[in-house]
Curated annotation (Swiss-Prot):
Enzyme's top EC category: hydrolase
Catalyzed reaction equations: agmatine + H2O = N-carbamoylputrescine + NH4(+)
Name of the protein this chain belongs to: Putative agmatine deiminase
UniProt organism field: Legionella pneumophila (strain Lens)
Single Gene Ontology MF annotation: protein-arginine deiminase activity
Source taxon at top rank: Bacteria
Family of the protein in this entry: Belongs to the agmatine deiminase family.
């Protein structure tokens, strides 16, 4: 850990820091999209990419031979296509985690990926996505000796990390490490000072409780937390517990959080399995927010109205995202922001 980014002054900026681009990957894994099929998955990803491209460039990784479908569905928009062999399409988890320093130089962290604790047999190609992205952006490369996914943590860019015990302390990730050792890795590789641990994620989450489904930073000293008013819902107690933890926590600068809440949509099932639907799983672009709608008019409307309130100065774009969530994740899961840096990327 002597070569960790923090000692060189690098840290992960908050998602509201200006972006150079957004990274995505084109759907390709048949098992992931077995509920709806690859064609519908590609159309769903195209909706997200085009919505984000209103605000910033999108770079899309596409398996060789599948470029035509990406070009046809994303034609005429601010979207660049790069051919790269991939196993799956969740760049939040498999892509680089970007860092900057006070000189606005760019670095990238390459975590170890084990397909969310071994959910899928082959993730060999995805283990190279981060290094390819880092090389493409000419960022400084850091390899982290830790199994980690980008959706398992949030940062405020001011020293605070938000994560969950269900995921990071799961025996299918880093069983040889203690909580204290994992904390030290996070602090050193994300350039932070304090970690806030939530306990449990959503019931049925294939990622073992990624935090980007349950809570996120929305501004310095402010967090947004998922809740449900339905006491019979199996998520009720775990979401309420997370809410209480956030209310009683302070960030790295000693601020008590201002906690906003958004209600989860009604339980929704596909092929007998409950989908992990959450309005928390959105993408914050340059002056824009791309957030999900799930087809529940009153819930979607209330979530939209809340976002208008808590994100002043941002254009809120709400898109049908049920098909994205059918694959086990959401809008935040399929995107990865690259912060603006001192040296522009050479094309």
């Amino acid at each position: 850990m002597n070569t960790a980014p923090k000692q060189y002054g690098f840290y992960m900026p908050a998602e509201w820091y200006p972006h150079e681009r957004c990274w995505m990957a084109w759907p390709c894994h048949h098992e992931t999209w077995s509920k709806i099929g690859l064609d519908k998955a590609k159309m769903a990803y195209a909706r997200v990419a085009k919505a984000i491209a209103q605000f910033e460039p999108v770079t899309l990784l596409v398996n060789p031979g599948d470029e035509d479908s990406a070009k046809n569905l994303c034609k005429g928009h601010n979207i660049e296509i790069i051919s790269l062999p991939i196993n799956d399409s969740w760049t939040r988890d498999t892509g680089a985690t970007f860092l900057i320093n006070n000189e606005r130089q760019l670095a990238g962290v390459d975590w170890i990926h084990n397909a969310w604790g071994g959910n899928y047999a082959d993730c060999s190609l995805d283990n190279f996505i981060a290094s390819h992205i880092i090389k493409y952006t000419e960022a400084q490369y850091f390899h982290a000796p830790l199994v980690m996914e980008g959706g398992s943590f949030h940062v405020d860019g001011e020293g605070t990390i938000l994560t969950s015990k269900e995921c990071l302390l799961n025996s299918n990730r880093n069983p040889h490490l203690s909580q204290q050792e994992i904390e030290q890795y996070l602090i050193n590789y994300l350039g932070a000072e304090r970690i806030i641990w939530l306990n449990m994620g959503l019931i049925g989450d294939e990622t073992d409780g990624h935090v980007d489904e349950i809570a996120t930073f929305i501004a310095p000293g402010k967090v947004l937390c998922l809740i449900t008013k339905d006491k019979e819902d199996p998520n009720y107690h775990r979401l309420q517990e997370n809410f209480e933890i956030l209310k009683s926590s302070k960030d790295a600068r000693g601020r008590t959080f201002e906690v906003y809440t958004v209600e989860q949509p009604p339980a929704t099932y596909l092929n007998g399995e409950r989908l992990t639907l959450s309005y928390i799983n959105f993408y914050m672009a340059n002056q824009g927010i791309v957030m999900p709608a799930f087809g529940y008019e009153s819930f979607d409307r209330l979530a939209y109205q809340l976002f208008v309130q808590i994100f002043p100065g941002y254009q809120i774009t709400q898109i049908d995202a049920l098909d994205v969530f059918s694959g086990g994740g959401g809008i935040h899961c399929i995107t990865q922001q690259q912060p603006k840096s001192h040296k522009l990327v050479e094309q």
